[in-house]
Design a protein with these regions (language model features):
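A well-structured
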Residues: 1-281, 293, 568-569
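C-terminal, non-catalytic "cap/extension" segments appended to globular domains
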Residues: 118, 230, 321, 357, ...
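Post-HExxH zinc-binding segment in Zn-dependent metallohydrolases
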Residues: 245-246, 370, 381-409, 417-419, ...
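Gly/Pro-rich turn-and-neighbor structural signature
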Residues: 266-330
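Short pre-active-site segment immediately N-terminal to the catalytic Zn-binding motif
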Residues: 282-287, 338-358
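Active-site scaffold of zinc-dependent metalloenzymes
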Residues: 323-350, 367-368
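Short beta-alpha connecting loops at secondary-structure transitions
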Residues: 342-346, 373-384, 410-420, 438-439, ...
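Catalytic Zn2+-binding segment of zinc metalloproteases
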Residues: 362-376, 397
Length: 570
């Protein structure tokens, strides 16, 4: 069994990709039977697997050290030729949609209708005339990513990457928290010209692409690019209303109480990361202890999760140390040719480190479990909202094992985790609606964008005050929310998934084994059913129905009160 560091990387030249793809497209067009179409599909899937593996390996090695000249060049290569590869696949998609054998393939179950539906959405997301714009977009995104990865924050004599600075945002000492946010704001302000300029470029590039493709603005194209098969802007509008009506008042009430316990009035942005006056629970140990606890947890959870964690640890499929020039976020990717998931994170000694072995491992488990699904190349593990349900739900299924990570602080962790999960819904809704407004108004100035952010904060998080925090008080919190620059419209997915994950938590409190079995069934199907159908099958409520979050809000608040009462007895 090879370790991830030993996996061989070979560039797949675009010329070779193009030759193979062209031959496959011709084979589909000239097919005399359904079987010939299937043979071409097999070849195309093999080509896609090789391409995605090479691209993912090069990106992973770039992200663990963004200053590595070789992998930086490889990443830039894929940024440049990726749109050309997409264009070849677009021609393949057109050929597949046009084949006279489509009905026969669907009826025989050789290719499920959802594959063809996903092809139709892909057609709406891509066109040869926007290739140059896609290359330009990739280049600007790379500039932003590198700037953020290399940005250092000078705090008390140390130069820290942002993940390490944010550790101080959870300090029980308010002066330290305030200072950390001041350093964050001042450092971002020093880069404000680039932050505004890069985003402005991205907005205009994306708007130009949308208009070239005949869309009114980038909102429509953005949804197609996300491959959404069961909801659009109207459904998200209803979801936003559900959050405003049922979640915002509960979160505001709970957070006000937390502020009172912390003895702070008003509740400032730099108070928001702290829940307990004595300091929030942190794992009882470093990296080794966390991984030992994770192994024990997954072995107890089920035989399958036990095999999964052994595989991940034996292949050294984690890179979790925070260091300079390492990409600042966390992600799970996979290398399909090797059926190998991989997790990158930046441990900083907070509870977030444990979330890596629950949340990101939830993604990895889905990759591991669906690796051999018959339609995994076309449909993956599902839409992003489905994928995030896998990860966010795993965080909650890990609750019975939190004593392995937090010892006697397990109860405090559960309270904090649930409060954070609920509090996230208004924030994620802001991130999504901000993007909608920005792309509907592409000619807004940087000041108008910042004003829109401030207005959304006042609407969805009225309990937080930004006043007096350098730069961030201007409405710039979004400038280090990297999704907004890098992957537009990939954020509401987290919110939709959170509503499903909260329901899995509430169900697991009634019958853990039954809820976990429903979760594994949900996860195992990958993308072979759309999100709303998977929810229905798991007996969970769709977040798009009017009033869908009322019960989630009430039951989650009741559970928080119950957890709080237990903590008060300690």
């Amino acid at each position: 069994m090879k370790k991830v560091s030993e996996l061989e990387y070979t560039r797949l030249p675009i010329e070779d990709f193009g030759k193979e793809a062209t031959a496959i497209i011709e084979q589909v067009k000239n097919a005399a039977s359904a079987q010939e179409v299937l043979a071409a599909r097999d070849k195309c899937n093999d080509l896609i697997i090789r391409w995605e593996t090479a691209e993912a390996l090069s990106y992973m090695r770039y992200s663990i050290n963004t200053a590595d000249a070789f992998y930086l060049a490889e990443k830039e290569y894929y940024d440049e030729v990726g749109p050309q590869a997409q264009n070849y696949l677009l021609e393949y998609t057109k050929a597949m949609l046009a084949t006279p054998f489509r009905k026969e393939l669907e009826e025989q179950g050789e290719i499920i209708p959802l594959v063809f539906r996903s092809f139709e959405v892909e057609l709406k997301a891509m066109s040869p005339e926007i290739i140059e714009d896609m290359i330009a977009e990739n280049q600007v995104v790379s500039q932003y990513s590198q700037m953020m990865a290399g940005m250092e924050f000078e705090f008390r004599g140390e130069k820290l990457p942002r993940p390490m600075l944010m550790k101080y945002a959870k300090s029980p000492d308010r002066a330290i928290r305030k200072e950390a946010y001041e350093v964050l704001g001042k450092t971002l302000k020093a880069h404000s010209e680039q932050l505004d300029g890069l985003f402005d470029q991205l907005v205009h590039i994306r708007d130009r692409m949308a208009k070239k493709m005949g869309y009114r603005n980038f909102v429509e194209l953005g949804y197609y690019r996300m491959g959404r098969l069961c909801y659009g802007p109207e459904e998200v509008k209803q979801f936003r209303e559900n959050v405003r009506r049922d979640i915002v008042p509960v979160v505001a009430r709970l957070r006000k109480e937390i502020g009172e316990k912390l003895g702070v009035e008003p509740l400032m942005l730099y108070d928001y990361d702290l829940i307990f006056p004595q300091g929030d629970p942190a794992p009882k140990g470093g990296k080794e202890e966390i991984f030992a606890a994770a192994r024990a947890m997954y072995h107890d959870m089920s035989e399958e999760t036990g095999k999964f964690i052994d595989f991940m640890l034996e292949t050294e499929a984690f890179d979790v140390d925070s260091r300079k020039n390492k990409w600042g976020g966390g992600y799970c990717t996979h290398f399909p040719a090797y059926h190998q998931p991989f997790i990158l994170a930046n441990f900083n000694g907070t509870a977030g480190d444990v979330d890596v072995v629950t949340h990101e491992a939830g993604h990895a488990f889905a990759d591991y479990k669906t690796a051999k699904n018959p339609f995994v190349v076309e449909l993956g593990v599902g839409g992003m909202e489905t994928a995030e349900t896998h990860s966010m739900s795993m965080e909650f299924f890990a609750w019975p094992y939190m004593d392995k990570f937090f010892g006697e602080d397990a109860g405090r962790y559960e309270f904090m985790h649930l409060l954070d999960a609920l509090s996230f819904l208004p924030y994620g809704t802001i991130v999504d609606d901000f993007q909608r407004q920005v792309y509907e108004n592409p000619d807004w100035t940087p000041e108008e964008r910042k004003a829109a952010w401030r207005k959304l904060e006042a609407e969805f998080r009225p309990h937080i005050t930004f006043d007096g925090i350098p730069y961030l008080e201007e409405g710039t919190r979004w400038q280090y929310q990297m999704h907004i620059y890098e992957t537009p419209f990939y954020y509401i997915d987290y919110c939709l998934a959170q509503t499903a994950a909260l329901q899995f938590l509430l169900e697991s409190r009634k019958d853990y084994a039954d809820a976990f079995a429903r979760y594994v069934r949900f996860l195992s199907q990958g993308g072979e059913k759309v999100f709303t159908d998977l929810l229905e099958e798991a007996d969970l409520r769709s977040p798009f129905q009017a009033g869908a979050l009322q019960a989630v809000a009430q039951e989650s608040e009741a559970l928080l009160r119950q957890l709080e009462a237990k903590l008060d007895q300690l």
